[in-house]
Amino acid sequence: MAEFEERPRLSIGEEEAPPYPLEKLTGGRRTRAQIHALHQQAGRVPPQAVELEQAVLGAMLIEPEAIPRALEILTPEAFYDGRHQRIFRAIVRLFEQNRGVDLLTVTEELRRTGELEQAGDTIYLSELTTRVASAANVEYHARIIAEKLLRRMIEVMTLLVGRAYDPAADAFELLDEVEAEIFRLSDVHLRKAARSMNEVVKETLERLEAIHGRPGGITGVPSGFHQLDALTGGWQRGDLIIIAARPSMGKTAFALSCRNAALHPHYGTGVAIFSLEMGAEQLAQRLLTAEAASMPRRPAPDGCATRTGVSWPARRPLSDAPIFIDDTPSLGVLELRAKCRRLKAEHDIGLVIVDYLQLMQASHMPRNANREQEIAQISRSLKALAKELNVPVVALSQLSRAVETRGGDKRPQLSDLRESGCLAGDTLITLADGRRVPIRELVSQQNFSVWALNPQTYRLERARVSRAFCTGIKPVYRLTTRLGRSIRATANHRFLTPQGWKRVDELQPGDYLALPRRIPTASTPTLTEAELALLGHLIGDGCTLPHHVIQYTSRDADLATLVAHLATKVFGSKVTPQIRKELRWYQVYLRAARPLAPGKRNPISDWLRDLGIFGLRSYEKKVPALLFCQTSEAIATFLRHLWATDGCIQMRRGKKPYPAVYYATSSYQLARDVQSLLLRLGINARLKTVAQGEKGRVQYHVKVSGREDLLRFVEKIGAVGARQRAALASVYDYLSVRTGNPNRDIIPVALWYELVREAMYQRGISHRQLHANLGMAYGGMTLFRQNLSRARALRLAEAAACPELRQLAQSDVYWDPIVSIEPDGVEEVFDLTVPGPHNFVANDIIAHNSIEQDADVVLFIYRPERYGITVDENGNPTEGIAEIIIGKQRNGPTGTVRLAFINQYARFENLTMYQPEPGTPLPETPDETILPSGPPDEAPF
């Protein structure tokens, strides 16, 4: 890593060149200091209305009804004052979560995100509420602020134009920046307000009158395939149509059949084709070949054929057709949008075709975004383009390899289009109410909430799940971290790393994964303290098998007495506890008070059966699902009594004494449950496998280590029983006189280095100044090669004035290295769609979701013969047959349309239309024969 250059701090009054070069003035990275310095140089003050900003925020704080009115007009960027941007974002977050918005809640939200001081502190927030008496004029004030934003953006454009005179500036990079700014400006300008029903109905009736009388019930742009048009009504205006298939299935050939839209005598319209894969000449050759093949097969007059076998009359319809081909490689969304706008204005195009989606480039993606999110942004941009131009946009898309690995007939499905991975069916999804549910049991459920990581704040938040679904049978891999957290996923499923989201097949041992540092808990308990305590003892040292008396065993007399007391407190006179002292143990028998008739059971047995934990042997034990829906205090009570059974709390003596705090069990499920319950108390325990050799079953230890986690255990959980309380006191005495060595809960250098480097660059802080701010001797680059503890990261964030690092230091993320990635069989897999954050907590690991398709229509091309399938389910031959599967249609039915695929011409035809003349053999290749053609003025329909 190169060392930073020493740069002087910004001095507003200096005449010399500012320390921020204009090259840094890009749409997503410019700072308020940069803009202000540039304006000072130009001698102008940026357009602003700070007093009105204060009035709008004050109105939003005192009157909740002002919030939606302001949100329709303003974005955070509309506010000139950085304090106001932070306050506005806090209000928006509270509003989106349906939480109350007032001075107190906004203050607390800013304090939670560490932005309270940057937002002006509590005094400034209080002053905002006095700036306005009511919210009556909030909409008028908001429009003035929005107008100032437009003027400010126009002025930024003027500054960018000034860069054209800089000989060191890259012209193409400058062009991209200017184009991005123009579209940011137009995006603000084109935001629409709600329209009245009267206006909408009038436009709808005019549209219906215009299409009245069209043959075939086609209301949009025809595809040229009768059965397909019967299901879709043609490609509708404002729709995004995705045509997806594996390579060599005929995606481009199918899309080029849409040339019929340009050549149709009744529905003719301009077509724009953006080919990122093939050149314009290649497309023209395919169009000519397909067009010639569609003409009547007649003897060709002399001189009417070319050497390639394509008849000259085929040129006439295509040459005159309003088809526009652009073969720019790696086309960006902004550039595509600009070209489509121009073609719409100059030629009134009615259809846009993009070939293909995965070759496009998104603009201004977040630093930790992955390819799936980039494709999703491109898809959303294409949908926005379709609505803006009011034309259908047809985008081709490559399906994932999951189609090839799936068994059966390999028909494509929607999950193949999402470019996302999947999780094994037993993966436990943490719902927002605390429950952990296997993902397979969530299939077909909708609109439930999970915990997800906000990618901007790195905090866990509630997020709604729009869909849970099965994606087929696929190979899975078991991924295990150093803490022992484990998850089984397909090779293409993504997990969060310091470098962004990565697929399983891109990960390797040693890479850091994002895990939640804590899981929020419920606010109201549903179990009493006595029930929680009794459960802890019975799960740990209880015998609850059928046809056996409920029995508890302990070596401590005080614990035996406690369990007998708890049973009486919970079940009253229904049970009669009996304590029997044996040689080394105390047995507590929890018998029913009355003799049990046939069909009657001990009330404790019924209780445990209702909780789902009756009849389990030691290696099968688990924590009831209801425990995960309790408050943190209730969970602590349960763990305190569970630890009194098979838990260890003691000081290990020797040359280097250390505290040993762990829970031991032969049940892997119980160990995972205990680890997850500790996480709800903010304790990141390690699950360790301990082999027993010939002594017995493998044991699993849930180990609490590290000063911070041990102190949380002492303070939140504690101990029960004289023996463990004394041991816990010794542990606390040891911790109270020692400092911690936080080498586990760290911020990886790969995550924080670039953030601090950018902050230093923008604020003109040199290496020496940074070390001085930290109170350290200058050490060169040594600091920048280390992982940081959270405390040290906070100090560095203050020294470098880096709010992003402060967020990471106060985040809900624990970065844990991977220890193994192993194949783990082939089975049915599943996934979720979580709009917004696009992730969720699964097996106490943060996993990416499957992004919902923005398309209005999704078509799949399926040719069975490509997979060696020679006959269909009815015994009919599949040679030359293609299925067009409508996997999704927002405003119409789904279904399958069968078409003919003429391989020689790479052309699709209506299955009933294509009838070769008897005795006319099809050529093996187009180059081996001269194609006959009809009269030059004959239409192709």
Swiss-Prot record:
CDD domains attached to this UniProt entry: DnaB_C, Hint
- Reaction(s) catalysed (UniProt annotation): Couples ATP hydrolysis with the unwinding of duplex DNA at the replication fork by translocating in the 5'-3' direction. This creates two antiparallel DNA single strands (ssDNA). The leading ssDNA polymer is the template for DNA polymerase III holoenzyme which synthesizes a continuous strand; ATP + H2O = ADP + phosphate + H(+)
For whether the record's keyword set contains Hydrolase, the answer is yes
The SF4 helicase domain, residue ranges: 214-484, 646-915
Name the Pfam families on file.
Answer: DnaB (PF00772), DnaB_C (PF03796), Intein_splicing (PF14890), LAGLIDADG_3 (PF14528)
Task: Share the record's PTM remark.
Answer: Upon expression in E.coli this protein undergoes self splicing that involves a post-translational excision of the intervening region (intein) followed by peptide ligation.
Here the disulfide bonds are none
Residues annotated as region Disordered?
1-25, 914-941
Q: Which GO terms describe its molecular function?
A: ATP binding; ATP hydrolysis activity; DNA binding; DNA helicase activity; endonuclease activity
Keyword field = ATP-binding, Autocatalytic cleavage, DNA replication, DNA-binding, Endonuclease, Helicase, Hydrolase, Intron homing, Isomerase, Nuclease, Nucleotide-binding, Primosome, Protein splicing, Repeat
| InterPro entries attached to this UniProt entry | DNA_heli_DnaB-like_N_sf, DNA_helicase_DnaB, DNA_helicase_DnaB-like_C, DNA_helicase_DnaB-like_N, DNA_helicase_N/primase_C, Hint_dom_C, Hint_dom_N, Hint_dom_sf
Q: Where is the DOD-type homing endonuclease domain?
A: 534-683
One GO cellular-component annotation of the UniProt record comes to:
cytosol
Can you supply a Gene Ontology BP term from the record? Answer: intein-mediated protein splicing
Please state the Enzyme Commission number of this protein: 5.6.2.3, 3.1.-.-
* Residues bound to ATP: 245-252
Does Lipid metabolism appear among the keywords?
A: no
Q: Which SUPFAM superfamilies match?
A: Hedgehog/intein (Hint) domain, Homing endonucleases, N-terminal domain of DnaB helicase, P-loop containing nucleoside triphosphate hydrolases
* Subunit structure comment from the entry: Homohexamer.
NCBIfam families with a match to the protein in the record: DnaB (TIGR00665), intein_Cterm (TIGR01443), intein_Nterm (TIGR01445), PRK07773.1 (NF005852)
Role noted for this protein: The main replicative DNA helicase, it participates in initiation and elongation during chromosome replication. Travels ahead of the DNA replisome, separating dsDNA into templates for DNA synthesis. A processive ATP-dependent 5'-3' DNA helicase it has DNA-dependent ATPase activity.
Q: Which family does it belong to?
A: Belongs to the helicase family. DnaB subfamily.
Q: What is this protein called?
A: Replicative DNA helicase DnaB
